[in-house]
Amino acid sequence: MALSHSQKEKIVNLLEKKIEDKLRRYARETSSMPFLTRLIQDSEKVAAYSFIHSIATTLGMSIYEDVSKIIAEETSDECFTKYDVGGVISRKQKSTIDNIVRKLRNGEKKAHHEEEVKLLLYASAKDGKAQKEGRIADFYMKREGKEYFFEIKTVKPNIDVFTKSKTKLLEWVARRR
């Protein structure tokens, strides 16, 4: 499905605003880049690199959330960035999640979403408690009565980032059961 003219316009405006804001607020985080300075041997190029890296970071994760919302707005019942999933998690559910993630990390099993969801739904939700951590989805949308929660990550996350993200996704299932 192609983007509508309105969506394209909103995305262009968003990018322009983010870049203009960055240009207005840009302050070099550090002038000490000895390795890069020795490697490139041109302090102006190092400063340019620092600026480009800063722009790339600005246009990084937060921009994906905003663009996701722009794309989804026209075809979903509702959509939000930084959505509070809510709900509670029991000790039994937490134990089930820890077990799934440990087995995946150790290579004892392959990921199988439907099976993991069944295990979580089977785990008792009795005496569930609210948790502060892991409650926020980067992006949420509801379409035709079905809820979708998204955790947006960079390409090729390391194993620790993967583990934390997988845990969070499984916790969302437990919270919304």
Please report, for each region that a protein language model flagged, where it lies by residue.
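Nuclease-adjacent, charged terminal/linker segments that flank catalytic cores
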Residues: 1-89
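Generic detector of short, locally flexible boundary/turn motifs and exposed helical patches
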Residues: 17, 21-22, 34, 44-48, ...
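Surface-exposed cleft-lining segments at the edges of enzyme active sites
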Residues: 52-55, 122-128, 152-160
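Short, well-structured alpha-helical interface segments that form or flank functional binding sites
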Residues: 54, 58-67, 134-136, 160, ...
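Conserved catalytic cores of phosphodiester-cleaving nucleases, focusing on short active-site segments
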Residues: 72, 137-156
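Residue-level marker of positions within ordered structural domains that often coincide
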Residues: 77, 144, 174
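Active-site metal-binding core of divalent-cation-utilizing nuclease and nuclease-like domains
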Residues: 83-144
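Acidic, metal/cofactor-coordinating or nucleic-acid-engaging core segments within structured domains
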Residues: 131, 156-177
